[in-house]
Amino acid sequence: MATSNHSSGAEFILAGLTQRPELQLPLFLLFLGIYVVTVVGNLGMIFLIALSSQLYPPVYYFLSHLSFIDLCYSSVITPKMLVNFVPEENIISFLECITQLYFFLIFVIAEGYLLTAMEYDRYVAICRPLLYNIVMSHRVCSIMMAVVYSLGFLWATVHTTRMSVLSFCRSHTVSHYFCDILPLLTLSCSSTHINEILLFIIGGVNTLATTLAVLISYAFIFSSILGIHSTEGQSKAFGTCSSHLLAVGIFFGSITFMYFKPPSSTTMEKEKVSSVFYITIIPMLNPLIYSLRNKDVKNALKKMTRGRQSS
């Protein structure tokens, strides 16, 4: 590899998920199956919400965007990972590497803010039900989504711009199965101090601040739910929040474990395994989490299925 990333011929080798040849085929089949389920599940959710007249409230508007984002950031990583199970050397150009990192960051950061926006929607629905249609109007929801995507583009641009000016001359092997920030920083022979500061600040805002906002919202939500006198009302309110709380916990828990831990607390091999969870498993689980416990989604799916059978 060239001693600097400014050469058009600069290349990296992705170490991959495992170095054991006997696991290549089983892992390929496993992640291919997961990716197929992810694509079918998220595309199905998007089309179901778009075509069903029942799924018009703002929560489903946000859910369709969540499915889109899950589909996108999974597609940025998983196809390349599947291809890399085949050749012996998993070569990726510097431009392809930076592009992969850029789009991955856009969608992962956007998902964090989107989950926070969805939490605000639940807060208004439960704590301010009489004002819900006014506060969560279509215009407000559209503005919120514009902010979500804008923040994703902004922070991803900051990270990748700083990454693109680094020189990589120590090694050409990335100890990961995709181009993530931390493995790339370890390969740089120029100062990464600014990159590390940006990672800490931006990561703190994107993860810790949004997590805190979610926790505060849920404190108000649970307080309002406990004030409901009927058991049926409490059960229904808890049901509307449980799916989102599970999705939020899995996503932010995985991200926090990956990027906000002591450097020596785990090996790179363990980091690969944990990153698989939020890159491939979470996008597959989200449509299931939101549909299995949601009567409106299940009823809309049944209605659409019956309509096709009758036609």
Curated annotation (Swiss-Prot):
<feature type="transmembrane region" description="Helical; Name=6">
    <location>
        <begin position="238"/>
        <end position="258"/>
    </location>
</feature>
<dbReference type="GO" id="GO:0007186">
    <property type="term" value="P:G protein-coupled receptor signaling pathway"/>
</dbReference>
<feature type="transmembrane region" description="Helical; Name=1">
    <location>
        <begin position="26"/>
        <end position="46"/>
    </location>
</feature>
<keyword id="KW-0297">G-protein coupled receptor</keyword>
<dbReference type="GO" id="GO:0007608">
    <property type="term" value="P:sensory perception of smell"/>
</dbReference>
<keyword id="KW-1003">Cell membrane</keyword>
<feature type="topological domain" description="Cytoplasmic">
    <location>
        <begin position="47"/>
        <end position="54"/>
    </location>
</feature>
<keyword id="KW-0552">Olfaction</keyword>
<feature type="topological domain" description="Cytoplasmic">
    <location>
        <begin position="121"/>
        <end position="139"/>
    </location>
</feature>
<feature type="topological domain" description="Cytoplasmic">
    <location>
        <begin position="293"/>
        <end position="311"/>
    </location>
</feature>
<feature type="topological domain" description="Extracellular">
    <location>
        <begin position="76"/>
        <end position="99"/>
    </location>
</feature>
<feature type="transmembrane region" description="Helical; Name=3">
    <location>
        <begin position="100"/>
        <end position="120"/>
    </location>
</feature>
<keyword id="KW-0675">Receptor</keyword>
<comment type="similarity">
    <text>Belongs to the G-protein coupled receptor 1 family.</text>
</comment>
<dbReference type="GO" id="GO:0005886">
    <property type="term" value="C:plasma membrane"/>
</dbReference>
<dbReference type="GO" id="GO:0004930">
    <property type="term" value="F:G protein-coupled receptor activity"/>
</dbReference>
<feature type="topological domain" description="Extracellular">
    <location>
        <begin position="161"/>
        <end position="197"/>
    </location>
</feature>
<keyword id="KW-0812">Transmembrane</keyword>
<feature type="disulfide bond">
    <location>
        <begin position="97"/>
        <end position="189"/>
    </location>
</feature>
<dbReference type="GO" id="GO:0004984">
    <property type="term" value="F:olfactory receptor activity"/>
</dbReference>
<feature type="transmembrane region" description="Helical; Name=2">
    <location>
        <begin position="55"/>
        <end position="75"/>
    </location>
</feature>
<dbReference type="InterPro" id="IPR000276">
    <property type="entry name" value="GPCR_Rhodpsn"/>
</dbReference>
<dbReference type="Pfam" id="PF13853">
    <property type="entry name" value="7tm_4"/>
</dbReference>
<keyword id="KW-0325">Glycoprotein</keyword>
<feature type="transmembrane region" description="Helical; Name=4">
    <location>
        <begin position="140"/>
        <end position="160"/>
    </location>
</feature>
<feature type="topological domain" description="Extracellular">
    <location>
        <begin position="259"/>
        <end position="271"/>
    </location>
</feature>
<comment type="function">
    <text>Odorant receptor (Potential). May be involved in taste perception.</text>
</comment>
<keyword id="KW-0807">Transducer</keyword>
<dbReference type="InterPro" id="IPR017452">
    <property type="entry name" value="GPCR_Rhodpsn_7TM"/>
</dbReference>
<feature type="transmembrane region" description="Helical; Name=7">
    <location>
        <begin position="272"/>
        <end position="292"/>
    </location>
</feature>
<protein>
    <recommendedName>
        <fullName>Olfactory receptor 8D2</fullName>
    </recommendedName>
</protein>
<dbReference type="InterPro" id="IPR000725">
    <property type="entry name" value="Olfact_rcpt"/>
</dbReference>
<keyword id="KW-0472">Membrane</keyword>
<keyword id="KW-1015">Disulfide bond</keyword>
<feature type="topological domain" description="Extracellular">
    <location>
        <begin position="1"/>
        <end position="25"/>
    </location>
</feature>
<keyword id="KW-1133">Transmembrane helix</keyword>
<keyword id="KW-0716">Sensory transduction</keyword>
<feature type="glycosylation site" description="N-linked (GlcNAc...) asparagine">
    <location>
        <position position="5"/>
    </location>
</feature>
<dbReference type="GO" id="GO:0005549">
    <property type="term" value="F:odorant binding"/>
</dbReference>
<feature type="topological domain" description="Cytoplasmic">
    <location>
        <begin position="218"/>
        <end position="237"/>
    </location>
</feature>
<feature type="transmembrane region" description="Helical; Name=5">
    <location>
        <begin position="198"/>
        <end position="217"/>
    </location>
</feature>
